[in-house]
Amino acid sequence: VSEPWLVVIDPQRIFAAPDSEWGSPLWPGAEANIATLLPRFSGRTIITRWVPPAPGRREGSWSAYMAAWPFADRDPADPLFDVLDVVRPAIQGGAVVVDAPTFGKWEQIVAVTGPAPHLVVTGVATDCCVISTVLPAADAGATISVVTDACAGSSLEHQQAALTVMGLYPPQVDLRTTEDILRSPV
């Protein structure tokens, strides 16, 4: 197994701000743990951003989805989609930033890492973009450590449900804490 990559899923204002309809109440705790992990993965960090699908490219249910959430139907350059300060030093240090108009980011991640990587996954929302990235990655042969205390769900109940589901996929997926990763990232 190759050296692990840290993946920070969607650390953006839209998912972190308390005044955002999609703001995670669990983000502050996850953010602190992400900040702790970032220096450990210098040169091997991927940061993802969710951006809305372009109006002419909304296949199938994406049109209905964007109609249901009009506050998020904005230009991808809107400050609502900006990454948060916690990841800016990593970006300045060379972290790869990938954008995707989908919940899952596996396709964009594997384009950076190559096939069958070891991923240490953090971010928001555990019950949406994190799980939608982790399960296809596991299916493709990636080894994944989901850092439970560095992920933020849309609610505590949804967080636990998503972690329970991802925990059903050993050995492809294991659930670890920030402390576990700091002791031994592999």
Region spans (language model):
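A short alpha/beta connector and helix-capping loop motif
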Residues: 2, 6, 19-51
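Acidic/polar short surface loop at catalytic or gating sites that assists cofactor/ion binding
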Residues: 54-74
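Short acidic, Gly/Ser-rich segments with clustered Asp/Glu that frequently serve as metal-coordination loops
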Residues: 12-18
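Glycine-rich, phosphate-binding/catalytic loops in enzymes
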Residues: 23-26, 63-65, 137-139
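Active-site flanking residues adjacent to catalytic metal/cofactor-binding acidic residues
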Residues: 9, 48, 148
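Acidic-leg catalytic submotif of subtilisin-like serine proteases
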Residues: 6-12
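Active-site-adjacent betaalpha module
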Residues: 1-5, 33, 40-43, 69-186
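Active-site loop signature of alpha/beta-hydrolase-fold enzymes
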Residues: 14, 53, 153
